[in-house]
């Protein structure tokens, strides 16, 4: 489902050159409302005070690596997919063409690459992986489908990708670093006088410092294309 939804943004990009970030945000914003309605309506658990579905049966939940924490075997799936994406992007013909389309669309088109195809396929793949991430969260972290459980997950993914500079293997330490910031901010708010605003500012400053080089490179490449 995630791949199909993200694929729509790729189709819009191919047909009308729309910004895939904006279209995917608009589509997901509408679908989140529908999913929340289903969770709190037809699938709501009347025995639970939470706005959520019934708990996932134990036999379908992911095994915990540490019983006292929420860390589960989805970590190994994430490592596997990160390595798989790295291999696909750097060791296959399709991956090479996909990277060329991302680096310079006109150069790729001049080289005979079907640029339109590689506007849709990456969106389908990334949407599918994002859908898997949501499934892992339900089966491993929450053990049920909560209203708004995916809030901010997509933006976190963008932040991690910026920190990792779009390197699939670097996504692993980048995600751990980002999770450390998130957990540290929550712990600071719970165990000290640090407010949510202060924690958010500290996170933002660290994030901007880490991603400054990536943003500078993005702006520089756009200037070179304009010239």
Residue positions per predicted region:
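Short, Lys/Arg-enriched, Gly/Pro-containing loop segments at transmembrane-helix junctions
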Residues: 46-50, 95-100, 219-227
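Cytosolic-side transmembrane-helix boundaries in multi-pass membrane proteins
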Residues: 103, 110-117, 183-227
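Short loop segments and helix-boundary regions at transmembrane helix junctions
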Residues: 1-49, 91, 152, 156-168
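Terminal peptide-recognition signature
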Residues: 12, 19, 30, 98, ...
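Transmembrane helix-bundle core of multi-pass membrane transporters
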Residues: 20-91, 198
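Helix-loop-helix "hairpin" substructures at the membrane interface of multi-pass membrane proteins
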Residues: 66-144, 168-169
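Hydrophobic core segments of alpha-helical transmembrane domains in multi-pass membrane transport
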Residues: 2, 28-36, 74-87, 126-134, ...
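Transmembrane alpha-helical segments in multi-pass inner-membrane proteins
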Residues: 124-204
């Amino acid at each position: 489902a995630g791949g199909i939804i993200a694929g729509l943004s790729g189709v819009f990009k191919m047909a009308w050159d729309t910004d895939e970030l904006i279209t995917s945000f608009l589509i997901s914003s509408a679908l989140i409302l529908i999913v929340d309605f289903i969770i709190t309506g037809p699938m709501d658990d009347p025995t639970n005070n939470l706005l959520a579905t019934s708990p996932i049966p134990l036999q379908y939940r992911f095994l915990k690596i540490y019983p006292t924490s929420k860390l589960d075997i989805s970590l190994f799936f994430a490592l596997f997919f990160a390595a798989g994406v790295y291999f696909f992007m750097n060791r296959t013909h399709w991956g090479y063409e996909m990277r060329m389309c991302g680096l310079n669309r006109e150069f790729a088109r001049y080289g005979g690459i079907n640029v339109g195809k590689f506007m849709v396929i990456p969106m389908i793949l990334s949407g599918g992986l994002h859908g898997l991430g949501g499934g892992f969260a339900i089966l491993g972290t929450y053990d049920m489908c909560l209203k708004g459980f995916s809030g901010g997950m997509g933006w976190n993914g963008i932040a991690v990708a910026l920190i990792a500079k779009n390197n699939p293997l670097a996504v692993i330490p980048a995600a751990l670093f980002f999770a450390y910031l998130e957990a540290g901010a929550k712990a600071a708010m719970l165990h000290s006088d640090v407010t949510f605003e202060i924690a958010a500012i500290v996170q933002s400053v660290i994030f901007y410092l880490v991603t400054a080089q990536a943003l500078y490179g993005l702006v520089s490449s756009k200037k070179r294309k304009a010239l």
